[in-house]
């Protein structure tokens, strides 16, 4: 069958399976929900009916030959990749599979200090040796930045035997390094470029966004579809570039070392549907998110004492670009640490932020944010300043 981006092969196969009224004498033991009515009442019948085991009509994640294979090919096309692997152990598994695919025990990898623990754990279990590059730091905001091209190039020169360079794109706070230039330099020295795009799904679909890994020519990227792409928590993509020179079979073998053999069809179908949604409507969705984030920034900055920062931070070096969908808010000029504002928002206003640190709170924006939710956040921040604000806590 010839599929287009308007198709969702896994979802479509699940719907056919559901209509067939198959009698299950396989796992899972809840048997379409009949074996656990309490769980069925909680999750709903549709969810329980499609929480099924691998079988011929539904393919097998460990060795896909039909609908999962077709869904992965559609995702690769949508993201401009050579291959795409559906991951159900989270982007942690994607990051670890990237590192294990290109490095072996004793190999060096050039990597920023502010990497996710998944990358650290991958190096621990594999025996890969890190060559750390310190990211820049904004001392007023107290946040890590990207890597300077000069520092990456020096690390490459000092470690010509390194196998790969690892880049965050973007960071939690929306900061992007000069990914194109880093990729160009790394490739000139025979090194692979691995990109943690856990917070960068939207970079593949929005206009005027920071460059994504595949467009920049990187070799592999770990993409958290569930963070900003609308799939279910724990679902992720692992992308391999068209010119990476890394075989699909090799990467699949690495993935199968650690990924479950019981791939959840709830997670798989959510990846399939989210890919379809963004492939067909992504430009409009991303424009909506940017508009919402920009409005929130403007209104928050009007309050006074808060600083919701954006691309005015860009310096062409360790802040080469800024992801405007990230709503990062500096709080210390109202006399409160970010974590204090985070706790007050949660405990007193029932507003759950993504994180709070010593100087900032972060809101993750998506197409699911409503204008009234943004107004509620702005109003809460204004009231927090009035009720709890103190003399400025000063700079970090």
Give the label of every model feature segment.
Residues 1-66:
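N-terminal "arm"/small-domain region of PLP-dependent enzymes with the aminotransferase-like
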Residues 3, 64, 225, 260-263, ...:
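Generic alpha-helical structural element
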Residues 10-15, 19-21, 39-42, 63, ...:
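Conserved PLP-enzyme active-site core in the AAT-like
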Residues 48-93:
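Conserved N-terminal alpha-helix of the aminotransferase class I/II PLP-enzyme fold
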Residues 58, 85-87, 165-168, 328, ...:
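Short glycine-rich or small-residue beta-strand-to-loop segments that form or flank ligand, phosphate
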Residues 90, 115, 170, 332-333, ...:
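Structured loop/turn residues at secondary-structure junctions
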Residues 295-396:
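Conserved C-terminal alpha-helix-loop-beta "cap" of PLP-dependent enzymes
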């Amino acid at each position: 069958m010839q599929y287009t981006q308007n198709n969702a092969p896994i979802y479509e196969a699940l719907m056919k399976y559901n209509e067939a009224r198959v009698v299950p004498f396989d796992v899972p033991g809840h048997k379409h929900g009949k074996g656990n009515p309490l769980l069925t009442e909680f999750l709903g019948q549709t969810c329980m009916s499609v929480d099924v085991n691998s079988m011929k009509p539904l393919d097998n994640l460990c060795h896909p030959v039909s609908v999962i294979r077709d869904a992965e090919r559609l995702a690769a096309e949508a993201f401009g990749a050579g291959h795409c692997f559906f991951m159900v152990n989270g982007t942690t598994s994607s990051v670890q599979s990237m590192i294990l695919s290109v490095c072996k025990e004793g190999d060096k990898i050039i990597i920023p200090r502010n990497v996710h623990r998944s990358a650290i754990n991958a190096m621990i279990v594999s025996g890969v040796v890190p060559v750390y590059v310190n990211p820049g730091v904004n001392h007023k905001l107290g946040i890590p930045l990207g890597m300077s091209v000069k520092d990456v190039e020096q690390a490459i020169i000092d470690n010509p035997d390194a196998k790969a360079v690892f880049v965050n794109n973007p960071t939690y706070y929306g900061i992007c390094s000069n990914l194109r230039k880093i990729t160009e330099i790394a490739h000139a020295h025979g090194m692979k470029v691995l990109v943690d795009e856990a917070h960068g799904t939207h970079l593949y679909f929005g206009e005027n966004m920071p460059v994504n890994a595949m467009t920049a020519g990187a070799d592999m990227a770990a993409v958290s579809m569930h963070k900003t792409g609308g799939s279910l928590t724990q679902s992720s993509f692992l992308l391999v570039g068209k010119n990476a020179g890394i075989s699909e079979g090799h990467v699949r073998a690495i993935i199968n070392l650690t990924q479950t053999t019981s791939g959840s069809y709830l997670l798989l179908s959510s990846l399939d549907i989210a890919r379809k949604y963004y492939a067909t409507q992504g430009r409009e969705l991303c424009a909506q998110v940017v508009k919402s984030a920009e409005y929130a920034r403007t209104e928050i900055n009007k309050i006074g004492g808060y600083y919701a920062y954006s691309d005015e931070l860009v310096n062409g070096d360790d802040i080469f670009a800024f992801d405007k969908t990230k709503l990062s808010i500096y709080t210390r000029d109202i006399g409160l640490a970010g974590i204090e504002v985070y706790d007050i928002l949660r405990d007193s206003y029932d507003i759950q932020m993504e994180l709070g640190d010593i100087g900032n709170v972060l809101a993750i924006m998506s197409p699911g944010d409503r204008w009234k939710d943004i107004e509620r956040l702005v109003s809460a921040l204004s009231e927090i300043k009035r009720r709890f604000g103190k003399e400025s806590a000063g700079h970090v």
